[in-house]
């Protein structure tokens, strides 16, 4: 009897509290109604009025509300602001209540954006709070504009920071200065433990103060935090100083900027122990060689440069203080100051402000980790102090008043702050000279021969495991820096380089990957490489990568246009270095997934077969736009797959003309090891469809291991669809459970007949059926009836596509 009594007591308490505030709330509701010319509005329901009163006094009533019975609490949840709604989550779950629908409605009403159809949202609370954090940080949302977002007892940034798993920094590094400000220390501490992915999009030129803030932010989030992935997107003209800063910090190197505050966490970690003479070398690995004269010279140059920058920073300090003060004032005005949040009741699991223990510097590096950045030219003293980043490194020769530094006596450049001179020379000639100077730098010679400052003076901490560069053109000095960092980046597990304009720098990349693969503890297992052009044909490049990284598990490579070596008639066509291309056999590797996107032109089948023969563990192969000289060459590839790749489960062909390879297609469909085959836009039924379709169906009926067949874009038509229905007949041993027939000129009457045949054979549910971009809008009633019947047999995925867009395709099939 105790439980019902407690329930009634809580209900009475709720009614008493609500009644005490009802008159005040009613007067506020009625006042505007009397003055309205349109007449009085309908009063809110009594329970809703009571709920509003309780939600407005949650600061006093929170513990009592948490103890309310489930039915009453369920009605109050939609009336709470986002802060109390987030805090009550655990209690609601214990009472069998879900807040997901409330968070979804908040997303629709406040964020006003629709998630991507490809995105599967598992937790709307986390998604909303993460987006809310980003909007508040950038100042793109006014928390005072909606009562559900505004509460003086909470800091929007601090309260939502624990849900942030992915943070995006855009344009002029907005948000970096705010996050490292002293009032937001607890916000940054929370981010250090919750944030996993850091993204940079559409970066623009930034000043020294913004870069200093970013340096502190990256140090806290990567070196002392949990960030494991850094991605850069769409940076058409990268600022070299900023790009190299992001790279070196991601690789685990840390050098406090000139005039910057010391790291509190580093001080706590080193407090209580005497500094070691060889501390720098220990941080870089026990097997690091001793510093030679050139490296000592480079370190001295860096120290000189930092002193000069410290003077500039001191002169710019007043302006910086004004900027930071105005930034903090704007944050305070927006309600984003880090006040101390009210502690939840004793039943809450929340413990805001819990300090993360500082991470100790990593000491597992087993080889030299010096960064390599090319030496830059100092601008004249009368030039503007702002850096002028360029797409390519320019020499200062011929520029009046410019000074060329040579040797150690000249003034140095810091690793993170380059000033470039625009010279009147041709870019190609300058790149060639830089390449001549840089030759051999990645083959074991001293990086100081490039004039690159050594990083031995830097401490090395925790580094990220995933690096992604999308549409970020790499200049020569940026590519050299990346390659030199990669050669000892043993913690890196996944590397993506997409449309970076590597050009001849691909050879330096191969050298660095080869050096990385021999390092003890190398973890690189996934490489994604795509570009417009490549100095190597794609198959030779694939062979070189597989030889350089024999432990690689996933390789995705795409080249959009053929290289010069694909056209021997091009004059001055020089071959690659001898250590990159060789005729020797490829050693056995660990590849499990290989994806290749080919440029136009016939590909040599023997080269592809050599890669497949060495990849005995291959489980997934995807060929995009591959062209072979003859069907026999394609058959040679398929025969190699059957003999050497016995573990292959998934095979995909996209945008390939297989109209003349019907016997090879039948050979694939009879393979009893494959579980999934994709023929996407392969023109399968362009020739002899009446003879080929029955042969194809017969091969599939006898294959009991094939689970998925994808045939989008092959002009199957109604006749082909009805022929495929025979795969599910009673005399078939097929176990097909996924079928994709998108973009196949299928009409509603054909789809309806297909559904009736499946019903007649009674095979039961066979899985998923995809029907995107077919001509189902020509008879909407028949299409709806067909889909209704199909849904009793399988899970149907379709869309409302306008078939008039496919007029040309329709004419071609008349």
UniProtKB/Swiss-Prot annotation:
Residues 389-403 have a biased composition (Basic residues). Gene3D superfamilies: Ribonuclease Inhibitor. It comes from the Eukaryota. Residues 354-385 have a biased composition (Low complexity). GO terms for cellular component: cytoplasm; nucleus. LRR repeats lie at residues 489-509, 520-532, 533-557, 615-637, 638-661, 703-730, 733-754. The modification Phosphoserine is found at residues 155, 276, 326, 375. The modification Phosphothreonine is found at residue 327. Residues 265-408 are annotated as: Disordered. Keywords: Leucine-rich repeat, Phosphoprotein, Repeat, Ubl conjugation pathway. Residues 45-54 are annotated as: Interaction with Elongin BC complex. InterPro entries: Leu_rpt_41, LRR_dom_sf. The elongin BC complex binding domain is also known as BC-box with the consensus [APST]-L-x(3)-C-x(3)-[AILV]. Part of a E3 ubiquitin ligase complex with elongin BC complex (ELOB and ELOC), RBX1 and CUL5. PANTHER family: LEUCINE-RICH REPEAT-CONTAINING PROTEIN 41, MUF1. This is Leucine-rich repeat-containing protein 41.
